[in-house]
């Protein structure tokens, strides 16, 4: 988020940090990191340490604020209130059907207030009847947010702008 605020692409910064530096080889990239473990693990560690786990609490606040941050950045470039916006990928992690604590749903909830229309799709997720198929979403949307980094999204030929904080498309993560 800091890099983005200064107009820098964190994907490029991360690549430079990892270049010829094996200790940084597994440095994670940005994305809507979610799932049930961040809250659970933070609360367990805090409870073990007299509720003094500021790093964990702060990471949760940053993480939970990411959907609003991403939307705020998109609003600087696009008139969301006039657009059909899509979220491609609703699971909380790649190649999963698990939506527990998925920030893609928080992203959708906020976009419902900001955009003209909001569509969402994830062919892995079953039981959410609000989802449409991924091909239709790509065809119908004026702007797409990548909510989960499923590998199959790498091969999609998008015809509209894509907000891709996962760098699935390989074009960087600058919003």
Report the location of each language-model feature.
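Structural/interface elements that position substrates and couple domains in central-metabolism enzymes
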Residues: 1-175
């Amino acid at each position: 988020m800091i890099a983005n605020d200064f107009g820098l692409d964190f994907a490029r910064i991360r690549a430079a940090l990892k270049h010829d530096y094996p200790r940084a080889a597994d440095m994670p990239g940005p994305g809507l990191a979610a799932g049930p473990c961040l809250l659970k693990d933070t609360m367990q560690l805090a409870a073990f340490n007299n509720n003094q786990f500021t790093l964990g609490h702060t990471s949760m606040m940053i993480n939970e604020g990411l959907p609003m941050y991403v939307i705020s950045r998109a609003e600087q470039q696009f008139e969301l209130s006039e657009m059909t916006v899509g979220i491609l990928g609703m699971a909380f992690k790649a190649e999963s059907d698990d939506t527990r604590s998925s920030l893609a749903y928080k992203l959708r909830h906020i976009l419902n207030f900001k955009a003209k229309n909001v569509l969402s799709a994830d062919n892995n997720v079953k039981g959410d009847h609000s989802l449409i198929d991924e091909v239709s979403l790509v065809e119908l949307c004026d702007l797409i947010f990548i909510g989960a980094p499923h590998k199959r999204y790498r091969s999609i030929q998008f015809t509209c702008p894509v907000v891709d904080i996962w760098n699935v498309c390989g074009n960087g993560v600058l919003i």
